């Protein structure tokens, strides 16, 4: 059975589909992204009728997955609905990115009825061989938990998968057949169990003793990264940083995790590509705490970090180490609290962080001066205000912003590990839906935007007013810098970007083209004044101009090692 038999919206029977929605709502999900298909239509009726959860339809399944990712980064849980086969495979890239970047997304796939599957018929959206678990098996590689829901065990399996997603901060997969979705059941009898926890008192005691011995009377330095955010250990990290004068930095992946306006904030650490004062402070620290740090190629200067394990306390998700001695099971929050207590109890006040003399900033460009990368990112950072959510697509946008300090209260989102270009445009939709009270700022290259631009009209339909800066550098600039400076494969078709929003259904917007500094300044000033409108700024830049940090990274690469476009 693949088509509607009755009007589920008027059916008073409580179903497995309702149970799933109630569990998602319990974890803070109030919007679900997706694309309708005949295998999920009845379930969508239940979403529309739900008292808390709202349906947000997307232009395609890939964009829906990206939007769910952006939503999940801010809300701590999200969901996307697709249809069997053609729909779910379209979302696979997005789900894999969420897995790589530790984002909790529940992927709900509407499937054919169990009877139809059991008959092994050649149904549409299948491979025609009677095997309906091809795609379920694919999902095992890119999700932390999966379930092909059956009537008798559906509720228990829903709870299991959702709890795994919540615990591991990675996607889960639910195959919800049409007949299982409508199967009668009872509402949840109790809330989901709290996070299991996993700290051994003995491991904590031994870790604390070893950490105290290593720290002694040394000043501590901290390098933090995104897992602190994903594991909701920011308060514990902030308590550690306030227990003494603690110089600290983040990787690009964890940018905005900490207050970048703090006097103790060193900057962004990127291995050999770091600013020299930051590199020395991290690599020569008497004792270094690495909290939630994952060194990937694109955030570590291609693994050029020089961290001495003998002087390092490494705090991970479920285990920590002191000078390579491992202590487990030990949760991140507990380990951070232990280090904060060590600093508080020792009664020593460390000296202030040595701040290098401030270099004079660049002079304000002439209004008629043609735009370049430096002007663009400097002026954009001036335009940011507390509360903004900034998404920078992988390429010149991400690396152009990485070195700039953000105002307190700004959230920065990138995708430096998975690095799927175009991700940030739908992810910006998800972020804006998650927090409509915070203005979203999207920074994306022209080539990347061409992949996912269909979602622009959804912003307008949802009443959202982002600022979108399209970096028009006439093609794939990062690839030009790596290889093929004049090769035709790094060219793209030129679009009239100021005409695009209207063509895609945006009804309340301002679109401007900036070729010089004065036009950029005017556009960003107008964006600040037009808080209730989408503002699209096409920033025209030289095709071979790249930010200094990206230039530093690209200079040390062979072509297969680098990624990102525009």
Curated annotation (Swiss-Prot):
Entry keyword Lyase: yes
Cofactor note text: Binds 1 metal ion per subunit.
According to its UniProt entry, the protein's GO biological process terms are: aromatic amino acid family catabolic process to alcohol via Ehrlich pathway
The molecular function terms of the Gene Ontology recorded here are: magnesium ion binding; pyruvate decarboxylase activity; thiamine pyrophosphate binding
Q: Where is this region: Thiamine pyrophosphate binding?
A: 396-478
* Family annotation (InterPro entries): DHS-like_NAD/FAD-binding_dom, PDC/IPDC-like, THDP-binding, Thiamin_PyroP_enz_cen_dom, Thiamin_PyroP_enz_TPP-bd_dom, TPP-bd_CS, TPP_enzyme_TPP-bd, TPP_PDC_IPDC
Family, per the entry?
Belongs to the TPP enzyme family.
Q: What function is annotated for this protein?
A: Decarboxylates branched-chain and aromatic alpha-keto acids to aldehydes.
Q: Per its record, how is this protein called by name?
A: Alpha-keto-acid decarboxylase
Taxonomic source organism: Mycobacterium ulcerans (strain Agy99)
The primary gene name is kdc
């Amino acid at each position: 059975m693949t088509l509607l038999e009755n009007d589920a919206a008027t059916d008073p029977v409580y179903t497995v589909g309702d149970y799933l929605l109630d569990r998602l709502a319990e974890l803070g999900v109030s919007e679900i992204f997706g694309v309708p298909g005949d295998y999920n239509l009845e379930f969508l009726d239940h979403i529309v009728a739900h008292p808390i959860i709202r349906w947000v339809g997307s232009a395609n399944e890939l964009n829906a997955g990206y939007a769910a990712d952006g939503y999940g980064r801010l809300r701590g849980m999200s969901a996307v609905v697709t249809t069997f086969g053609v729909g779910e495979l379209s979302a696979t890239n997005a789900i894999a990115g969420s897995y790589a970047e530790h984002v909790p997304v529940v992927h709900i796939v509407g499937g054919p009825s169990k009877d139809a599957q059991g008959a092994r018929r050649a149904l549409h959206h299948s491979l025609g061989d009677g095997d309906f678990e091809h795609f379920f098996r694919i999902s095992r590689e890119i999700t932390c938990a999966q379930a092909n829901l059956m009537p008798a065990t559906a509720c228990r399996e829903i709870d299991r998968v959702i709890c795994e997603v919540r615990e591991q901060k990675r996607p889960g997969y639910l195959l919800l057949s049409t007949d299982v979705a409508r199967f009668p059941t009872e509402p949840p009898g109790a809330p989901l169990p709290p996070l299991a926890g996993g700290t051994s008192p003995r491991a904590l005691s031994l870790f604390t003793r070893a950490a105290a011995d290593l720290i002694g009377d040394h000043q501590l330095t901290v390098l933090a990264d995104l897992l602190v955010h994903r594991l909701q250990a920011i308060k514990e990290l902030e308590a550690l940083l306030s227990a003494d004068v603690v110089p600290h930095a983040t990787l690009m992946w964890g940018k905005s995790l900490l207050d970048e306006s703090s006097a103790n904030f060193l900057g962004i650490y990127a291995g050999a590509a770091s600013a020299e004062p930051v590199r020395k402070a991290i690599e020569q620290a008497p004792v270094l705490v690495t909290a939630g740090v994952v060194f990937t190629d694109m955030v570590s200067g291609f693994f050029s970090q020089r961290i001495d394990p003998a002087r390092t306390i490494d705090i991970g998700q479920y285990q920590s180490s002191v000078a390579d001695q491992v202590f487990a099971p030990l949760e991140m929050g507990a380990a951070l609290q232990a280090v904060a207590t060590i600093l508080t109890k020792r009664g020593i006040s460390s000296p202030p962080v040595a701040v290098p003399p401030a270099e004079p900033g660049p002079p304000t460009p002439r209004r008629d001066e043609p735009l370049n990368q430096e002007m663009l990112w400097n002026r954009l950072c001036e335009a940011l205000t507390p509360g903004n959510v900034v998404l920078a697509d992988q390429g010149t946008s991400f690396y152009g912003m990485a070195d700039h300090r953000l105002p307190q209260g700004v959230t920065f989102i990138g995708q430096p590990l998975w690095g799927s270009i175009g991700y940030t445009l739908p992810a910006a939709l998800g972020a804006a839906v998650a927090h409509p009270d915070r203005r979203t700022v999207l920074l994306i290259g022209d080539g990347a935007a061409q992949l996912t631009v269909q979602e622009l009209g959804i912003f307008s339909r949802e009443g959202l007013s982002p600022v979108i800066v399209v970096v028009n550098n006439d093609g794939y600039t990062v690839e030009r810098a790596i290889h093929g400076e004049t090769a035709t494969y790094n060219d793209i078709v030129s679009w009239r970007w100021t005409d695009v929003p209207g063509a895609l259904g945006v009804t309340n917007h301002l679109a401007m083209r900036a070729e010089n500094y004065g036009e950029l300044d005017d556009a960003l000033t107008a964006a600040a004044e037009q808080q209730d409108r989408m503002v699209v700024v096409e920033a025209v830049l030289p095709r071979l101009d790249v930010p200094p940090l990206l230039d530093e990274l690209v200079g040390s690469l062979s072509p297969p090692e680098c990624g990102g476009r525009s």
